[in-house]
Regions:
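Short glycine/proline-centered loop/turn elements that form peptide/ligand docking sites
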Residues: 190-194
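Short coil/turn motifs that cap or connect alpha-helices
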Residues: 115, 203-205
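Transmembrane alpha-helical segments of polytopic membrane transport and secretion proteins
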Residues: 1-44, 286-303
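Glycine/proline-centered hinge or cleavage motifs at structural transition points of membrane proteins
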Residues: 201-202, 215
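The alpha-helix within a helix-turn-helix
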Residues: 198
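Juxtamembrane non-transmembrane "cap" segments at the membrane-aqueous interface
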Residues: 241-250
Length: 303
């Protein structure tokens, strides 16, 4: 009896100790089927440190050597501001176009069966497999004033190559797979019987799309939009040929950074890159928060 009392007292003292409280507060990690959690976690942290954090820290450190006045002057010159407007504007327009047409392409690939469907599905990934420089040369050859498509458009008064329109076209070309491949698994998991049940209860096609399909696809849709937008901000190879690279007109920010590096202005290049990085990160974080909010709202609506 005394031994049981002493054991209970020891357990009570252990539970009231800091270590005991910590064990009760922290959830126990489930035993994994595959061993090596600490090794995998260590490898992940080292990878993030060497590949992500160290380069970004170096970027911020190098740009800080300019001082605040030099940094502000480097990132607010008229040439730099013009490149910001062109890069962010073209990336935003291209991502919006890809969001619309990507939804249509995904719907056709998932909901319809037709000859050549697998070929069309494979062609969606073509911009992933094609080197960006090859894509840029191909688009330039097509839409140049003497190109197959550029010559007829030129006669109609539409100039594509060496204009902001050509930049938007190139970003649209490389960004479409991000939207399609993000939406496709979500749409495949959406049961068509739910739509049929809503239609049998009197819902119109527009109501089915607006209240059933789009709310389920919206988080993935935002993710695809964000990925296409982020890819457009940093795209260089497919844009540099068709842009024309005229300062204040068709000069994109990645090209301006390369120009600064060729002029050995490393601090100025890192300053421009820092502004682009911070702005794109804030935009992507905002989109991510909006995506999480819409997912929570969509989950709470049925209850």
């Amino acid at each position: 009896m005394n031994q049981e009392t002493e054991t209970g007292q020891q357990q009570g003292s252990n539970s009231s100790s800091p270590l005991g409280l910590l064990n009760r507060v922290l959830p126990r990690r489930r035993a994994s089927v595959l061993p090596g959690f600490r090794l995998a976690l260590g490898f992940t942290l080292v990878y993030l440190l060497l590949v992500v954090l160290v380069p970004l820290s170096t970027l911020f450190w190098k740009s800080s050597t300019l001082g605040w006045a030099g940094f502000w002057q480097a990132v607010t010159s008229p040439r730099v501001v013009a490149s910001y407007k062109l890069t962010f504007g073209a990336a935003l327009v291209a991502a919006t176009i890809n969001a619309v047409f990507g939804l249509v392409v995904t719907w056709v690939l998932v909901r319809y069966r037709f000859p050549g469907r697998r070929l069309v599905d494979a062609l969606v990934d073509f911009p992933f497999a094609l080197p960006t420089a090859v894509a840029g040369i191909t688009l330039t050859a097509l839409y140049a004033p003497n190109g197959w498509l550029g010559a007829p458009l030129e006669r109609l008064g539409v100039k594509v190559a060496f204009t902001p329109l050509g930049i938007t076209l190139a970003l649209t070309f490389i960004g479409l797979p991000f939207v399609v491949r993000t939406l496709q698994p979500v749409l495949e998991s959406l049961d068509p019987e739910v739509e049929e049940a809503a239609a049998s209860l009197g819902a119109s096609r527009l109501q089915v799309i607006a209240r059933i399909v789009l709310p389920a696809l919206f988080p993935a849709w935002l993710t695809g939009f964000a990925l296409a937008f982020a890819r457009g901000l940093g795209e260089y190879g497919s844009v540099v040929f068709i842009a024309g690279n005229m300062p204040m007109k068709t000069e994109i920010t990645p090209l301006l950074i390369v120009t600064k590096l060729e002029q050995y202005d490393y601090a100025g290049a890192t300053a421009i890159a820092t502004v682009t990085l911070v702005t794109s990160f804030v935009l992507l974080l905002t989109i991510n928060r909006l995506q999480s909010w819409t997912a929570r709202v969509g989950t709470a609506e049925p209850s």
